Amino acid sequence: MVQISNVWGFGLAIMASLAAAAPKDCPDGLCLRTRANLSPLEVSQELGPLISNASSIFGPSDSRWANATARYQQYAAPKFTVVVRVARESDVSVIIKYANRNSLPFYAVNRGHGLPISQAKFSGLEIDMQLLTGITIQSNGKSALFQGGTYDQQVMDTLWEEGYVTTTGSCGCVGMLGPALGGGHGRQQGFHGLISDNILKLNVVLADGTTATVSNTSHTDLFWAMKGAGHNFGVVTSFEMSIYPTQVHSWYYKNYVFTQDKLEDLFEQLNVLQGNGTQPVKMAAQYGIYMMDSTVSATEAIIWWTFGYAGSQSEAQQYLTPFDDLNPLSSTDGNVPFPEVPNVQGTGINNATCDKGLERIVGPAGLQVYNATAQRQIYDLFNRNVKSYPELAASAVVMEGYSVEAVRKVDSDSSAYPMRDDYLLMQTTVSYSPNSTLDNVAIDWVTENQKFWNEGQPTRKPTAYVNYASGRESLEAMYGYEPWRLERLRKLKAKYDPEGRFSYYNPIV
């Protein structure tokens, strides 16, 4: 029997008939009535005997609760009433069947970095995946099996030690699967494509608790949907994806700090470098941030920009000389093994980008080239808002440019990911300690930035990478403007999740 790790919640206010019926009359949850207000103790007594011994069930009074329920984005966060921390993949199917029998909503969580405001509609049971961190390299050395709780830094470190790499997200602290189900951008994508492009097989628990192996030979319709809209269809307990022998053993990085007077020249040179989707594959990642740095100025944001090159400084220099010539305020550089690149480029597992507990109002946009006028408008608005609301000084405007060579080689119709002609990923993140009086200010700020970006490319429709989207954007902006895309997704939703169990992450219906 699983450990019953707290006795919180004896006295939830439920009808007397239900109190009499549970848990004694429902030892395994087989009740016909709605019991969505089950306490952690009741869930432990009923579900505990059905799942593996190493799994655990706990509520808010348990010492593990804070870690299990902490969110990167505290604004509009899901509400959890009980956590089930699974130790085996097979537990997930049992949990979902139990939850369904008791009309208890469930939500799978790995690292807690989801951004959509639709998550605020959730209240119920958390399926905590963070113990499922197994990685098995297949004997042919061409793929590996990853459990659903793996995360980027762990994957980079583990594969590197064995002489391999694969596409991961750029932030070391973020789970692999969350980004993968929406596409999955990162430093290796110019070489190998998105995370989702490299997935060979998914082991999925569907809405009714049944399991399915999803690949290009099994449930092929669902395989298409899971690669770009996967949050809408199931819980992935493990997945197999392609891995690649390490070819580059040392990466060169260079980080610059620019002042605002260099803004227009900077974006002119960035447009030359990224060449409307032709950024050299070895110039794997360049991205920047508008942010406050009080050691430089108390009133004007700095423009911080980093370049990650898969090779030596001498090879990279031809691309960096134009930026050196802008006379940056400062710069730092060096060569490191690939797993250390996140740390030196500001996205490591212990960097501030991974901090949890703040309100974060977000608003993305997808671009092909930078519009310098829009970039100036966004910069000036940043300074005005921080001056008017000093509590928002931790905010950032993030602008990402990865090589897209391998991404563009994949047929756009081959998966639900619709944005292979977005070459630059924009994101405003307004960050502050929980304070509801600032919410509308923050929403107005990100909305205005989205307007600037989108008006700066008048021949294109607005797009929003689904993993960066807040949910205020249109479904077409997230899932594609071709009518057949949403039509196909909705038909598959009706087939695989007719009751809408998976409807909390930018839902398609």
Swiss-Prot record:
PROSITE patterns noted in UniProt: FAD_PCMH (PS51387)
Name of the top EC class for this enzyme: oxidoreductase
Domain of life: Eukaryota
Domain FAD-binding PCMH-type: from-to ranges: 75-246
Catalytic activity of the protein: (2S,9S)-annullatin H + 2 A = (2S,9S)-annullatin D + 2 AH2
Cited InterPro entries: BBE, FAD-bd_PCMH, FAD-bd_PCMH-like_sf, FAD-bd_PCMH_sub1, FAD-bd_PCMH_sub2, FAD-linked_Oxidoreductase, Oxid_FAD_bind_N
Keyword Transport included in the entry's annotation: no
Function recorded in the entry: Cytochrome P450 monooxygenase; part of the gene cluster that mediates the biosynthesis of annullatin D, an alkylated aromatic polyketide with a fused dihydrobenzofuran lactone ring system that exhibits potent agonistic activities toward the cannabinoid receptors. Within the pathway, anuG is responsible for the five-member lactone ring formation in (2S, 9S)-annullatin D via oxidative lactonization between the two hydroxyl groups.
Name of protein: FAD-linked oxidoreductase anuG
Organism from which the protein derives: Penicillium roqueforti (strain FM164)
